[in-house]
Regions:
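Class I S-adenosyl-L-methionine
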Residues: 116-278
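Rossmann-like AdoMet
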Residues: 1-57, 61-119, 270-278
Length: 278
């Protein structure tokens, strides 16, 4: 449940948490993203503040948004004055955001459904890599879903049900794939991306996705980090940051199915460099 989740009651970010993201390293990251969004705003016809929305998926403590908002106050006052929607389910982080941005027009959402019907200018920084995935693994008799079982008092990975032929076709899994090949899918990521892509295709704007990812690779990318060190994925679940590499090709197909287009991906270093960070 949300109340029992990893982010529910603790601050997981920064040097005293489990991991550090780009906004905790330098405010330049947020400033560059703000400039990119301001450019996108101009390309979209420069809508007034009350005719658009700012959106962030997985804002954490609001560090990135604060840096972006500070920049917008200088370079794009319309974006600084626009209403903001944070997609955040953690009760703890929702409380932090409400307090931190009490002077702004902030809306907290648990899903990307029922957003205002206006152009959306959004960012998702290290958001999709934290959403749930499913894994399939190739065995001698075919593809099976990877499951989690209990060995005495320890969680362990085990083989689950075999994939139906329709599932193999849906996920483009080869029957002659090498033994122990692993394929990953994230229905949760595709559901959020589809909703945002549908919104952008209909009302305009765009969403900048910054994440660790891959393109059309089939391997096991599931990992866990606790206090800045790699740990076994099933070691003390709920107390470690579990993530995976985002499949940008899958997100691109999902966006295109909704009438939008995913541009990229490009390496983050190149993206930031071309926007001014050296």
């Amino acid at each position: 449940t949300t109340q029992d989740s990893y982010y529910a009651e603790a601050d997981r970010f920064g040097k005293d948490g489990d991991f550090i993201t780009a906004p905790e390293i330098s405010q330049l990251f947020g400033e560059v993203l703000a400039a990119f969004q301001a450019w996108l705003w101009e390309l979209s016809g420069s809508p007034d503040a009350n005719e658009m929305m700012i959106f962030e998926a997985g804002p954490g403590r609001g560090t990135l948004f604060e840096d972006m908002h500070r920049s917008w106050r200088q370079i794009c006052p319309q974006m600084a004055a626009a209403p903001v929607t944070f997609l955040e389910t953690s009760p703890y982080l929702r409380s932090v955001l409400t307090s931190r941005f009490s002077g702004l027009d902030i809306h907290l959402a648990k899903t990307a459904d029922n957003l205002p019907e206006v152009p959306l200018f959004g960012v998702a920084n290290e958001f999709f890599d934290a959403l749930a995935i499913r894994q399939a693994i190739k065995r001698d008799k075919g593809w099976v879903w990877r499951a989690i079982g209990l060995d005495i008092d320890q969680f362990v990975f085990c083989d689950g049900p075999a994939l139906h032929p329709d599932e193999m076709r849906q996920h483009k899994l080869a029957a002659d794939a090498p033994a122990d090949s692993v394929a990953e899918f994230s229905p949760a990521s595709e559901a959020v991306l589809a909703r945002l892509a549908r919104h952008v295709a209909r009302f305009g704007g765009g969403v900048l996705i910054c994440d660790y990812g891959k393109v059309n690779r089939q391997d096991d990318s599931l990992q866990a980090v606790r206090t800045h060190k790699a740990v076994p994925v099933l070691d003390m679940p709920g107390l470690s940051d579990i993530s995976h590499l985002v499949d940008f090709a899958a997100l691109a197909r999902c966006a295109e199915a909704q009438g939008a287009r995913l541009v990229g991906p490009v390496e983050q270093g190149r993206f930031l460099s071309e926007l001014g960070i050296k």
